[in-house]
């Protein structure tokens, strides 16, 4: 039997957010409650027109549909990240539905027919199974018996009838104690349009002009009609006053009940606090008596007095005697430190005198003349170059030798053929006369370019160390100061010191700090920078071809340097140092592991394969991280797993070890396995190095490491098919989400990869690689922008279907990879390709150009051989 009770329509906008208010009407998840009997609405008006209108409205009594607006939907986490004040917009009028629209809207909604006693609501709330109580809108419970719908946590819907407050007062007291009012929500019924009223047959008379109606005198109203009208108005006014009085009495009654309830609760809390206070007083008195008795017993015990005396003696010994000895030792150590600092200052003064060319006799004469002007001393110190000097091992006095060993080419690995260029620079110092005798001009400057961390500074030190010459190193940012003329003065001082200590190497790090193109910066700061650069240009030209001083500079931005600075004659050699390859990375790892306790079975090749794209500084840090982890675990040797784990830390960050549910692990595993399974079917991306679902450095997802051709993917030499393969791989997580969870359960885990696919598809179209040849010319015309998006969408749909086809064909492989990832959290290259061989179903790769050429050549040889055999047979 269906639930029957009349409901008034209420706006659903009170349950919806401002963004969703403009979308009504809409098919929300709903529960229908149908009323099979028409409800007659009777008014007290006696007017015939009012009765006619009332009868017309009664025709609209149709089955009522209740739409439950859930107020407990889970809010997304990103909604709390930023709260902004929303502008108030004018509320749009709600559209009413016709009778046919309302029937279509409520056609397939279920009918609630299951009943429960109203007392079961209290037990369901106590057990935590109650989710919502749906009540008619614009009505207040407790006044009279009202039918309601009960929604449980398992989405079941039941119906019951709640009693009035007078009928069951104890029920409503328990209702308030459990706080069920919070879970009450209003039902919603969309408004219905009234049917059109047919116009009367004499309706054309209404078109008569108004001034003609003035000729007809209105009929005088009778006394009976006037009395009825007055009585009707009095009745309406009395009825309205009674309703207002009833509402006020109800509000006052509710306030009185709440006040009484609060007063009772306040008395209960006061009684509880008083009881606790009295108990605490009794407990305190008892503890006080117990402590007094205990101290009295201890005071009378001689053993306790002896023990306390020993304790106080020990404290006195620790505080007085030992502290005195410690202070005495600290005083002696402080004297030793002061003596060592005095010796160090003396050595530093001697070193400064040596650098400035001041002899000891001159110092003694100057000491007799009196103290120098402190401002003059500060100015002289400020005008020095500030370069760090490292003397050659055969030129420096023994007391000034550095404790560290000079850097050699054996300390620098992963150079390849670049090392030959630098060895020639060393020969310019060691066999310079041989080059001059044959008329070979020795370069005056060498510019080292390359990404950060490839070892440009280390190479410059190795050149100076192999040549055995003095090495001056300075950062280009030290040339520029706020005072006018300081930069140029420091450049002159630097090259003056280098010339006095020739042969030598001047190394300028980060040359782009002072070598930018002139004229870009206006004002005094730009003039000072330009003056410093001009002095550097003159200093570089002054030593050209003499071989006494060679300048080596390093920069990450050779494109912004001044053309006059990098022209031949100043920097004759421009050496680009790229990131190391596979063999170079292996050599760098071996160099940094020379002084570390390495295991005998360490696989440097596996570590080098995992560190594709890393530079020397990152590889050195990997070895250090692995050594620290070894010490932390209490082991004595570094293994391959230590280096591989350190490589992951360097690339992706530290491991995030917070707990996750099994379903979350499985969803992330499906996302990563889909990319790997689809990529293994494409020739440019089939080299899968590593799979993991372990989150690192705050990233909730895992990653798939694919070794790709650097020239193709970094230098922009991708073919059309390679870009389509890339788009297919990026859409694989979305396709897997649809295949494994269905279209209704899609998540946003693949949002980032799908955005990458959209960007790649648009780049493919704008690059002129699509079927419609967009991007060749005038593609920013307004009427073609939509065509570009349509073409990009076609490419995305094609690649998406391709990804679904590959995943459907390899469903067994996907399930196995997902299970392994959920268990082990990571898969190596060998483990992944073992699963591919056992469960994979991939199409054969298309033949390459070389293979096609070989096949054609074999066919041609067979054809020529048959032709020769036929000719020989005919001649015989």
From Swiss-Prot:
<comment type="subunit">
    <text>Homooligomer. Interacts with FtsHi4.</text>
</comment>
<keyword id="KW-1133">Transmembrane helix</keyword>
<dbReference type="Pfam" id="PF00004">
    <property type="entry name" value="AAA"/>
</dbReference>
<dbReference type="InterPro" id="IPR041569">
    <property type="entry name" value="AAA_lid_3"/>
</dbReference>
<feature type="region of interest" description="Disordered">
    <location>
        <begin position="256"/>
        <end position="276"/>
    </location>
</feature>
<dbReference type="GO" id="GO:0004176">
    <property type="term" value="F:ATP-dependent peptidase activity"/>
</dbReference>
<comment type="function">
    <text>Required for plastid development during embryogenesis. Might be involved in chaperone functions or play a structural role in the thylakoid FtsH complex.</text>
</comment>
<feature type="region of interest" description="Disordered">
    <location>
        <begin position="350"/>
        <end position="370"/>
    </location>
</feature>
<dbReference type="GO" id="GO:0016464">
    <property type="term" value="F:chloroplast protein-transporting ATPase activity"/>
</dbReference>
<dbReference type="InterPro" id="IPR037219">
    <property type="entry name" value="Peptidase_M41-like"/>
</dbReference>
<keyword id="KW-0809">Transit peptide</keyword>
<feature type="compositionally biased region" description="Basic residues">
    <location>
        <begin position="258"/>
        <end position="275"/>
    </location>
</feature>
<dbReference type="InterPro" id="IPR003593">
    <property type="entry name" value="AAA+_ATPase"/>
</dbReference>
<dbReference type="GO" id="GO:0031969">
    <property type="term" value="C:chloroplast membrane"/>
</dbReference>
<dbReference type="GO" id="GO:0045037">
    <property type="term" value="P:protein import into chloroplast stroma"/>
</dbReference>
<feature type="transit peptide" description="Chloroplast">
    <location>
        <begin position="1"/>
        <end position="32"/>
    </location>
</feature>
<feature type="region of interest" description="Disordered">
    <location>
        <begin position="1"/>
        <end position="20"/>
    </location>
</feature>
<dbReference type="GO" id="GO:0016887">
    <property type="term" value="F:ATP hydrolysis activity"/>
</dbReference>
<keyword id="KW-0150">Chloroplast</keyword>
<dbReference type="InterPro" id="IPR000642">
    <property type="entry name" value="Peptidase_M41"/>
</dbReference>
<feature type="compositionally biased region" description="Acidic residues">
    <location>
        <begin position="357"/>
        <end position="368"/>
    </location>
</feature>
<dbReference type="InterPro" id="IPR027417">
    <property type="entry name" value="P-loop_NTPase"/>
</dbReference>
<dbReference type="GO" id="GO:0005524">
    <property type="term" value="F:ATP binding"/>
</dbReference>
<dbReference type="Pfam" id="PF01434">
    <property type="entry name" value="Peptidase_M41"/>
</dbReference>
<protein>
    <recommendedName>
        <fullName>Probable inactive ATP-dependent zinc metalloprotease FTSHI 2, chloroplastic</fullName>
    </recommendedName>
</protein>
<keyword id="KW-0547">Nucleotide-binding</keyword>
<dbReference type="Pfam" id="PF17862">
    <property type="entry name" value="AAA_lid_3"/>
</dbReference>
<feature type="binding site">
    <location>
        <begin position="450"/>
        <end position="457"/>
    </location>
    <ligand>
        <name>ATP</name>
    </ligand>
</feature>
<dbReference type="InterPro" id="IPR003959">
    <property type="entry name" value="ATPase_AAA_core"/>
</dbReference>
<feature type="compositionally biased region" description="Polar residues">
    <location>
        <begin position="8"/>
        <end position="19"/>
    </location>
</feature>
<dbReference type="GO" id="GO:0009507">
    <property type="term" value="C:chloroplast"/>
</dbReference>
<keyword id="KW-0472">Membrane</keyword>
<comment type="similarity">
    <text>In the N-terminal section; belongs to the AAA ATPase family.</text>
</comment>
<keyword id="KW-0934">Plastid</keyword>
<feature type="transmembrane region" description="Helical">
    <location>
        <begin position="304"/>
        <end position="324"/>
    </location>
</feature>
<keyword id="KW-0378">Hydrolase</keyword>
<dbReference type="GO" id="GO:0006508">
    <property type="term" value="P:proteolysis"/>
</dbReference>
<keyword id="KW-0812">Transmembrane</keyword>
<dbReference type="GO" id="GO:0009941">
    <property type="term" value="C:chloroplast envelope"/>
</dbReference>
<dbReference type="GO" id="GO:0004222">
    <property type="term" value="F:metalloendopeptidase activity"/>
</dbReference>
<comment type="similarity">
    <text>In the C-terminal section; belongs to the peptidase M41 family.</text>
</comment>
<keyword id="KW-0067">ATP-binding</keyword>
């Amino acid at each position: 039997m269906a639930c029957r009770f009349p409901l008034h329509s209420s706006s659903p906008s009170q349950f919806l957010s401002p963004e969703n208010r403009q979308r009504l009407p809409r098919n929300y998840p709903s529960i229908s409650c149908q009323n099979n009997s028409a409800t007659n609405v009777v008014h007290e008006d006696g007017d015939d027109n009012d009765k006619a209108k009332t009868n017309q409205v009664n025709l609209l009594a149709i089955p009522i549909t209740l739409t439950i607006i859930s107020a407990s939907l889970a809010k997304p986490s990103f909604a709390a990240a930023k709260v902004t004040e929303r502008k108030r917009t004018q509320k749009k009028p709600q559209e009413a539905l016709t009778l046919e629209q309302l029937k279509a809207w409520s056609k397939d909604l279920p009918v609630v027919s299951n009943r429960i006693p109203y007392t079961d609501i209290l037990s369901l709330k106590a057990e935590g199974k109650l989710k919502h109580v749906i009540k008619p809108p614009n009505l207040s419970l407790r006044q009279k018996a009202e039918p309601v719908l009960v929604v449980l946590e398992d989405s079941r819907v039941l119906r019951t009838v709640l009693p009035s407050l007078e009928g069951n007062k104890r029920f409503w007291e328990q209702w308030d104690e459990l706080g069920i009012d919070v879970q009450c929500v209003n039902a919603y019924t969309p408004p219905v349009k009234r049917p059109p009223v047919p116009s009367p047959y004499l309706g054309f008379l209404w078109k008569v002009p108004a001034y003609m109606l003035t000729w007809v005198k209105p009929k005088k109203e009778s006394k009976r009609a006037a009395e009825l009208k007055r009585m009707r108005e009095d009745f309406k006014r009395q009825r309205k006053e009674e309703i207002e009085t009833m509402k006020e009495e109800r509000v006052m009654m509710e306030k009185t009940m709440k006040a009484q309830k609060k007063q009772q609760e306040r008395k209960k809390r006061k009684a509880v606090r008083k009881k606790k206070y009295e108990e605490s007083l009794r407990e305190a008195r008892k503890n006080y008596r117990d402590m007094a008795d205990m101290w009295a017993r201890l005071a009378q015990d001689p053993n306790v007095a002896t023990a306390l005396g020993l304790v106080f003696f020990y404290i006195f010994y620790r505080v007085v005697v030992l502290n005195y000895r410690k202070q005495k030792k600290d005083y002696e150590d402080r004297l030793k430190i002061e003596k060592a600092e005095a010796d160090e200052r003396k050595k530093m003064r001697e070193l400064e005198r040596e650098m400035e060319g001041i002899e000891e006799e001159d110092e003694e004469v100057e000491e007799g003349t009196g103290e120098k002007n402190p401002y003059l001393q500060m100015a002289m110190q400020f005008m020095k170059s500030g370069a760090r000097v490292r003397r050659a091992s055969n030129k420096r006095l023994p007391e000034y030798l550095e404790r560290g060993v000079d850097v050699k080419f054996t300390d620098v690995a992963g150079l390849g053929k670049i090392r030959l260029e630098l060895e020639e620079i060393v020969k310019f110092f060691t066999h310079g006369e041989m080059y001059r005798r044959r008329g070979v001009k020795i370069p005056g400057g060498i510019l080292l370019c390359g990404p950060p961390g490839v070892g440009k500074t280390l190479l410059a030190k190795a050149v100076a160390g192999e040549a055995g010459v003095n090495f001056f190193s300075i950062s280009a940012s030290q040339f520029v100061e706020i005072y006018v003329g300081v930069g140029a003065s420091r450049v002159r001082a630097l090259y003056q010191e280098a010339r006095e200590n020739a042969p030598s190497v001047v190394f300028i790090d980060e040359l782009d700090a002072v070598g930018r193109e002139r004229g870009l910066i206006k004002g005094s700061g730009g003039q000072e920078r330009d003056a410093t650069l001009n002095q550097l240009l003159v200093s570089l030209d002054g030593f050209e071809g003499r071989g006494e001083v060679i300048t080596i500079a390093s920069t990450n931005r050779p494109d912004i340097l001044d053309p006059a600075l990098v022209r031949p004659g100043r920097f004759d050699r421009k050496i680009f140092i790229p990131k190391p390859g596979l063999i170079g990375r292996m050599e760098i790892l071996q160099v940094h592991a020379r002084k570390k306790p390495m295991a005998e079975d360490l696989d440097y090749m596996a570590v080098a394969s995992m560190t594709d794209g890393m530079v020397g500084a990152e590889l050195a840090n990997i070895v250090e991280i692995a050594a620290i982890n070894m010490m932390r675990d209490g082991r004595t040797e570094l293994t391959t797993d230590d280096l591989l784990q350190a490589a992951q830390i360097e690339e992706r960050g530290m491991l995030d070890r917070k707990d996750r549910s099994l379903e979350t692990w499985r969803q992330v595993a499906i996302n990563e396995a889909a990319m790997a399974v689809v990529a293994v079917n494409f020739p440019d991306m089939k080299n899968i190095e590593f799979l993991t679902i372990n989150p690192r450095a705050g990233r909730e997802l895992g990653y798939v490491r694919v070794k790709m051709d650097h020239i193709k993917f970094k230098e922009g030499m991708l073919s059309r098919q390679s870009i389509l393969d890339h788009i297919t791989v990026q859409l694989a997580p979305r396709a897997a989400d649809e295949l494994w969870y269905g279209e209704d359960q899609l998540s946003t885990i693949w949002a980032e990869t799908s955005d990458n696919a959209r960007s790649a598809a648009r780049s493919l179209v704008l690059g002129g690689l699509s079927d419609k040849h967009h991007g060749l010319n005038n593609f920013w015309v307004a009427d073609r922008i939509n065509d570009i998006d349509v073409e990009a969408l076609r490419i995305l749909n094609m690649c998406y279907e391709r990804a679904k086809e590959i995943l459907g064909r390899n469903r067994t492989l996907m399930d196995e990879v997902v299970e392994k990832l959920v268990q082990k959290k990571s898969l190596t290259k060998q483990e992944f390709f073992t699963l591919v061989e056992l469960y994979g179903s991939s199409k054969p790769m298309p033949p390459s150009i070389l293979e096609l050429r070989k096949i054609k050549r074999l066919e041609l040889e067979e054809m020529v051989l048959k032709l020769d055999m036929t000719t020989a047979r005919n001649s015989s």
